[in-house]
């Protein structure tokens, strides 16, 4: 009589693979297109505190030349100075370098962008220690640290609501802001990075009215800068305008309303898969629900499709958007109901966008920014964690690999760390790291990585239980 368990007359089949994310013994394992082992479903990494201080204006910028994320913030524990740190990601684990001061004075309205021509990070902010002038500074990341050049004033007047993007066709940084020295008119200026410094051309007004919450993004298919904002001179409607950079100046077409209601917390990104601009905002005409809309640039104008909700029936405050080139989707981070910080993923189709269910990122906070790390293949969040004294905090989110009818290969034999070696028990092996199975029962892989007796969609057989803790992997 033979024993149907670990004494099977079948050679054990195992394979060592690099783990794309941390795996636990007994996890169902999928194979990625790059040959790494992963598990179905999303993985949210642990929170890592950047510094034990209160923070505001939390910003994240991805440096694609170094595969690092720079997180910057206003340090409430040190006279509101400008501070930052470099974040490295492995799997969904964030490692934070030493904190660096980039501005010794009080700062606010902090934003930034990455200049892929000079491989520099550019931070923009209001320097409250220097008459609240609009200021920019260039940072160079090396290893786990960053160094800065000398700050440069781009507007010798009080500025508010700055935003920055990089025009890769002209190798220029474009900063959009409200110029308090000129009735808060919407204004833009072109910057050129050289070495560790930045110089500017003449400013151009894009909206001759009080402007709030401008967000600049670059349309790389049309080589245009798109600025979206709240036009306080037109009932606070959501509005966008297309800019064309020439040398050190920028000119604009006519403005287009994308939301005929009051908006707030405007953010935007560019979808390089579909060549569309995606604008996100809180729709005050609809209970401040988080909303997104798709824009199509043609020459110097932009047209919009139908808006879609990303926050369900909740508010969508402090929204920021980033594009994921690996999946061709748009990620939106925002503050939802009860100040819970959340993430939603949107897919553009034609001139519309649809969103799946939101994921909770942090239980309480306001400022939240995100970037997509194209090396680690994860979103990196920089949050103001209100549940932990408003400390600047980072964490990574792997959207995971979707289960298909072909990519399930077996089970993890033991625990494995991200980017470490994982031993995978393949077809014909018996994995003994399961619990509460029924011997003789067929089990199916679920889309969240668990196994169950009912097939998911797609239907993927995991194997047959041979005891309460063992499963014979389907060959």
Regions inferred by a protein language model and the residue ranges of each:
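A short beta-strand motif characteristic of beta-propeller blades
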Residues: 45-51, 97-102, 149-154, 201-206, ...
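Extracellular receptor-binding modules and their adjoining Ser/Thr/Gly/Asp/Asn-rich linkers
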Residues: 1-69, 73-77, 83-93, 102-120, ...
């Amino acid at each position: 009589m033979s024993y149907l368990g670990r004494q099977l007359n079948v050679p054990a089949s195992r394979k060592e693979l690099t783990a794309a994310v941390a795996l636990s013994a007994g996890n169902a394992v999928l194979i990625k297109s790059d040959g790494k082992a992963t598990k179905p479903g999303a993985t949210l990494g642990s929170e890592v505190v950047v510094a034990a201080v209160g923070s505001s204006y939390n910003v994240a910028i991805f440096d694609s030349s170094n595969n690092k994320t720079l997180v910057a913030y206003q340090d409430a524990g040190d006279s509101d100075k400008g501070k930052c740190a470099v974040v490295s990601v492995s799997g969904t684990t964030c490692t934070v370098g030493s904190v660096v001061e980039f501005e010794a004075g009080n700062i606010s309205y902090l934003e930034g962008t990455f200049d892929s021509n000079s491989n520099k990070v550019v931070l923009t902010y209001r320097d409250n220690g220097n008459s609240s002038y609009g200021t920019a500074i260039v940072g160079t990341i090396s290893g786990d640290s960053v160094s800065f050049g000398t700050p440069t004033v781009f507007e010798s007047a009080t500025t508010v609501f700055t935003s920055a993007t990089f025009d890769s066709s002209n190798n220029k940084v474009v900063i959009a802001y409200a110029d308090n020295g000129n009735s808060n008119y919407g204004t833009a200026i072109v910057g050129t990075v050289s070495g560790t410094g930045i110089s500017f051309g003449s400013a151009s007004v894009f909206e001759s009215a009080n402007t709030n919450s401008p967000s600049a993004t670059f349309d790389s298919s049309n080589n245009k800068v798109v600025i979206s904002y709240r036009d306080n001179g037109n009932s606070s409607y959501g509005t966008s305008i297309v800019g064309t950079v020439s040398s050190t100046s920028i000119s604009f077409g006519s403005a287009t309303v994308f939301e005929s209601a009051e908006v707030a917390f405007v953010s935007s990104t560019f979808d390089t898969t579909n060549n569309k601009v995606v604008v996100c905002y809180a729709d005050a005409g609809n209970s401040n629900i988080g909303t997104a809309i798709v824009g199509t640039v043609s020459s110097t104008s932009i047209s919009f499709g139908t808006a879609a909700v990303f926050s369900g029936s909740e508010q969508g405050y402090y929204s920021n958007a980033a594009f994921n080139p690996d999946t061709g989707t748009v990620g939106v981070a925002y503050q939802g109901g009860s100040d819970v910080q959340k993430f939603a993923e949107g897919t553009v189709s034609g001139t519309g966008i649809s969103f799946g269910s939101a994921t909770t990122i942090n239980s309480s906070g306001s400022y939240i920014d995100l970037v997509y790390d194209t090396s680690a293949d994860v979103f990196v969040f920089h949050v103001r964690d209100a549940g932990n004294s408003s400390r600047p905090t980072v964490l990574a989110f792997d959207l995971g690999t979707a289960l298909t009818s072909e990519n399930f290969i077996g089970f993890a034999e033991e625990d494995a760390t991200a980017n470490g070696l994982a031993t995978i028990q393949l077809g014909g092996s018996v994995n003994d790291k399961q619990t509460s199975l029924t011997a003789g029962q067929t089990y199916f892989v679920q889309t969240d990585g668990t196994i169950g007796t009912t097939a998911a969609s797609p239907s993927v057989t995991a194997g047959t239980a041979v005891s309460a803790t063992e499963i014979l992997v389907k060959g």
